[in-house]
Amino acid sequence: MRKESPPPLVPPAAREWNLPPNAPACMERQLEAARYRSDGSLLLGASSLSGRCWAGSLWFFKDPSAAPNEGFCSAGVQTEAGVADLTWVGDKGILVASDSGAVELWELDENETLIVSKFCKYEHDDIVSTVTVLSSGTQAVSGSKDFCIKIWDLAQQMSLNSYRAHAGQVTCVAASPHRETVFLSCSEDSRILLWDTRCPKPASQMGCNASGYLPTSLAWHPQQSEIFVFGDENGSVSLVDTKNASCTLSSAVHSQCVTRLVFSPHSVPFLASLSEDCSLAVLDSSFSEVFRSRAHRDFVRDATWSPLNHSLLTTVGWDHQVIHHVVPLEPLPAPGPDSVVE
């Protein structure tokens, strides 16, 4: 039986409790988002989804093993509402999708001990569910439960275009890592759209969702520019070739909705799949399962691969856990009755 062996942690006694200025005293329970920076620092987005006020916060940890302990963060800030999604903009900027309907840009300042607001734009009419930065680094895309997708100029701090191409709530947008004008979107209208902002009619429908289940998550293949994957509400993960809009591979990975898909930085990348069944699955290029963890006790919401250790995958969830998984890089033996990590 293969056990998870998390990276060694620094004993609490060896660390100094030092809550930075302006950081909230307490982190909300539901962890929604996690992103490693290129130097191995970890960014977290948290939300409180119960009670009279839906609050949120951002947290920056130079030592990821200390997360989610507030006293050992390097910077933190309270947000007006819950954090639905976030992503890095370079090494300093933080783009946030807010439950308030705002798209927010924050920035690390003061030797990375402060997170300061650069702009906050209320241009969506409902929760902003998803954000992504185009590969140019100067423009971003937001998707909302108001059915709209907006293109943003980050330097000018303004929206450039607004599209109502979907007939349902937008669940995910994903920028192509290969082409700076191309991204994907999916929605509760069951459709997946391929976008190219250079075109007069920028959206084209991908006829790849034959199952009829609602697509919930998208991710581009990091090396093959025409390939992407999507997850659906039924727990299946499918691989699509945009050249012919066909689904070339599909697997029933989870028993409930897929919440996030994240490719690894390996030369032959693994795919991390997260779900509301509280599990993490890691798949190889043929969609064979190489790793499974059920360590979370609530919905698993996000995952991020370490840029410094390619076998290290960090997940967060609504159980307030930040779990560091060591994914085997060598082939696993044939699965037996005890092969699932609990």
UniProtKB/Swiss-Prot annotation:
Gene3D superfamilies: YVTN repeat-like/Quinoprotein amine dehydrogenase (2.130.10.10). The keyword DNA repair does not apply. One of its GO terms (molecular function) is transcription coactivator activity. Keywords: Cytoplasm, Nucleus, Phosphoprotein, Repeat, Ubl conjugation pathway, WD repeat. GO terms for cellular component: Cul4B-RING E3 ubiquitin ligase complex; cytoplasm; cytosol; Golgi apparatus; methylosome; nucleoplasm; nucleus. Non-catalytic component of the methylosome complex, composed of PRMT5, WDR77 and CLNS1A, which modifies specific arginines to dimethylarginines in several spliceosomal Sm proteins and histones. This modification targets Sm proteins to the survival of motor neurons (SMN) complex for assembly into small nuclear ribonucleoprotein core particles. Might play a role in transcription regulation. Substrate-recognition component of the DCX(WDR77) complex, which mediates ubiquitination and degradation of Irgm in intestinal cells. Signal peptide: none annotated. PANTHER family: METHYLOSOME PROTEIN 50, METHYLOSOME PROTEIN WDR77. This is Methylosome protein WDR77.
